[in-house]
UniProtKB/Swiss-Prot annotation:
It is found in: Cell membrane. The chain crosses the membrane at residues 21-41, 336-356, 369-389, 396-416. The keyword Transmembrane helix applies. One of its GO terms (cellular component) is plasma membrane. Belongs to the GT2 glycosyltransferase family. This is Type 2 glycosyltransferase. Disruption phenotype: Results in impairment of vegetative growth, conidiation, stress response, hyphal appressorium-mediated penetration, and pathogenicity. Leads to altered glycoproteins during conidiation. Significantly reduces the expression levels of hydropgobin MPG1. Glycans are attached at N313, N421.
C-alpha cells in the first residue's frame, strides 16, 4: 500500500520576521518621518547624482585632424558699453584666437566711438554695425545675415578668452548632431580693496562656480541644461541664419507680448525643440574670464537671471514640453527645481520633519540622526565650491557669507517670480534706455483692409472674412424667424 503524501508545514520564522518587519516599519515611518524621507530624497538625490556626474565629466578632446578651424568662425558681440576703451583687453584676447571675422553691433549714437576704438586694434577683420535700439536680440539679428562662416560664436563684450579657446570650443562640432557648445567660466577676482568689495566679488565668483558644476553635471546625464550662457557660446551658423529661427527669435511671446529679453534662453530651447545636441567644454584651456557687479547692483543681476529662469523654464515645461521626452533628468533636476528649490524653506522643513519624526527614538539615536543631517547640510553648501577653494584656499573665510546669501537668494527668486513682467537690467549704464522694447505688445492686424478696385478676385483672406460675415448674418436672420 502506497504511503500517503505528507505536506510539511511551512516554517514559522519567515512569517514572524515579516510581521515584525511590518510592525517595525510602521512604527518607524510615522507621518513626519515619511515627510522627512520624501523631502530629503526630492532635494538631495539630484545633488548626489550631480556630484558623481560632475566629477566624472569629460570634455570632447581636440581631434588630430579637425574639421573646423578658427577661419571657420565669426564672433558676434552686441555692445552698449559706455566706454569702449575699457573693452580693449577683451577684444584683443578674442582677436588673438584669429577668428575669420569679428562683428560688433552697437546703437547709432555710439557707432562712431566704437569705430574709433576698432581702428586702433589693427585688425582688418572687424566690422561695425548699428541699430536704432539698445537690445541684444535686435543687435544680433543685425549681424546674423552678414555671417559667411560655418560657426558663429556669440559673446559678451566683457569676456576675456584664453589663447587656447578656439580649438577646444570647436572640438565638439566633429559630432554632426552637436548644434551648440558652451564654455567653462570664472569671475575675475578682486584681491585688493575693502572687505565689502571682496565679499561682492566672492558672491559673483561662487555663483559662476555653482553654474559650472550644474551644467557639467547635467550634460553628463542627458546632454541638457536650462540655458547655454550668452557670455560665450558657439553655434552652427545654419541654425542661427534659418528663417524660422530668426522669426521666432524676434517674435517670442510672453503673456501676450513680444519678449526681447532672455535671448540665450531662447537659443537653448530652440536647440532642444529642433533636436540639436549641446556640449560644455569644462577645461582650463577653454575657460573664459568675466566680470560681474561687485556692489549692491549684483542683486539686480541675480533678480534678472531669476526672472529669466522662471520665464524660460515655465515655457520649457508647459508651453513647448520638449524636455519631458528629450531631457528627463534636466526636467527633474533643473526645470522643476526652479519652482521647488527654496533653501530657506526646504532646509528648515527637512530638519523640522526629522526632529518630529524621531520623537519616539532613543535620545542617543535621535541626536545622531540630527547631527548626521546637519553634517550633510554643511556638505551640500560646500561641495559645489570645492574648485574655488582649491584655487584660492583663503576664500574659505567667505563661506558663511555664501551660506547666508544662499538663503537670501530664495527671497530674490520669490520676488523675481512676482515681477515677471519686468525686463530691466538695473545694473548697467544705459542698459535700460530702450527697456520698453523688451516686453511690448505685438503688432495688431488691421480689422479692415482696403483693396484697390480691380476686376481680379479678392484675396483669399478677404473671401474667408466675407464668408464668415455672411454666415453670422444668416444665423441672426434664422434666429429672428424662429422668434
Amino acid at each position: 500500500m502506497a504511503t500517503p503524501l505528507q505536506i510539511m508545514p511551512l516554517p514559522v520564522w519567515p512569517i514572524t520576521f515579516l510581521e515584525d518587519a511590518v510592525v517595525y516599519l510602521s512604527a518607524l515611518f510615522t507621518p513626519w518621518f515619511t515627510a522627512f524621507c520624501v523631502l530629503w530624497l526630492h532635494r538631495y538625490v539630484r545633488l548626489i547624482v550631480h556630484c558623481y556626474s560632475h566629477w566624472t565629466y569629460k570634455s570632447k578632446p581636440i581631434p588630430s585632424k579637425p574639421s573646423y578651424t578658427s577661419d571657420d568662425v565669426t564672433v558676434v558681440i552686441p555692445t552698449i558699453h559706455d566706454n569702449f576703451d575699457e573693452l580693449r583687453p577683451s577684444l584683443e584676447s578674442i582677436l588673438a584666437t584669429k577668428p575669420h571675422e569679428l562683428i560688433m553691433v552697437t546703437t547709432a549714437d555710439k557707432f562712431e566711438d566704437l569705430q574709433r576704438v576698432a581702428k586702433t586694434l589693427s585688425s582688418p577683420n572687424i566690422r561695425i554695425f548699428c541699430t536704432q535700439y539698445a537690445n541684444k536680440r535686435i543687435q544680433v539679428c543685425e549681424a546674423l545675415p552678414k555671417i559667411t562662416t560655418r560657426i558663429t560664436i556669440m559673446a559678451d563684450d566683457d569676456v576675456t578668452w584664453p589663447s587656447t579657446m578656439m580649438p577646444w570650443i570647436l572640438a565638439p562640432f566633429e559630432d554632426p548632431k552637436i548644434g551648440g557648445v558652451g564654455t567653462c567660466q570664472r569671475v575675475k577676482r578682486v584681491r585688493e580693496g575693502g572687505l565689502g568689495l571682496r565679499i561682492w566679488n566672492w558672491l559673483g565668483a561662487a555663483y559662476i562656480e555653482r553654474r559650472n558644476f550644474e551644467i557639467s553635471a547635467t550634460h553628463n546625464m542627458d546632454g541638457g541644461t536650462s540655458c547655454m550662457s550668452g557670455r560665450t557660446g558657439a553655434y552652427r551658423s545654419e541654425i542661427l541664419r534659418d528663417y524660422e529661427f530668426l522669426e521666432g527669435f524676434m517674435k517670442e511671446e510672453w503673456w501676450g507680448k513680444i519678449l526681447k529679453a532672455d535671448d540665450d534662453n531662447f537659443v537653448s530651447r530652440w536647440l532642444v525643440s529642433h533636436k540639436w545636441k549641446t556640449w560644455i567644454q569644462y577645461e582650463q584651456e577653454c575657460e573664459l574670464e568675466t566680470t560681474l557687479e561687485d556692489n549692491i547692483k549684483f542683486l539686480y543681476q541675480c533678480s534678472r537671471w531669476a526672472r529669466s529662469n522662471w520665464r524660460s523654464n515655465w515655457t520649457s515645461l508647459v508651453k513647448e514640453r520638449h524636455v519631458w521626452k528629450q531631457q528627463w533628468w534636466c526636467t527633474y533636476a533643473l526645470h522643476i527645481a526652479t519652482f521647488t528649490s527654496l533653501a530657506f524653506v526646504f532646509d528648515f522643513l527637512i530638519l523640522a520633519a526629522l526632529w518630529w519624526g524621531t520623537e519616539g527614538w532613543e535620545p542617543v539615536n535621535r541626536n545622531r540622526a540630527i547631527y548626521a543631517q546637519l553634517a550633510f547640510l554643511a556638505f551640500s553648501k560646500v561641495v559645489k565650491l570645492v574648485g574655488l577653494f582649491r584655487r584660492h584656499p583663503a576664500d574659505i573665510m567667505f563661506l558663511p557669507v555664501s551660506i547666508i546669501f544662499g538663503y537670501f537668494h530664495g527671497l530674490i527668486k520669490i520676488y523675481a517670480g512676482l515681477t515677471l513682467n519686468m525686463t530691466s537690467w538695473g545694473s548697467r549704464t544705459d542698459g535700460d534706455t530702450d527697456d520698453a522694447h523688451r516686453l511690448a505688445p505685438g503688432p495688431v492686424r488691421c480689422s479692415s483692409l482696403n483693396t484697390p478696385r480691380s476686376e481680379h478676385k479678392l484675396p483669399h483672406y478677404m473671401q474667408e472674412r466675407d464668408e464668415i460675415v455672411n454666415e453670422k448674418q444668416q444665423m441672426r436672420e434664422e434666429e429672428w424667424e424662429h422668434l
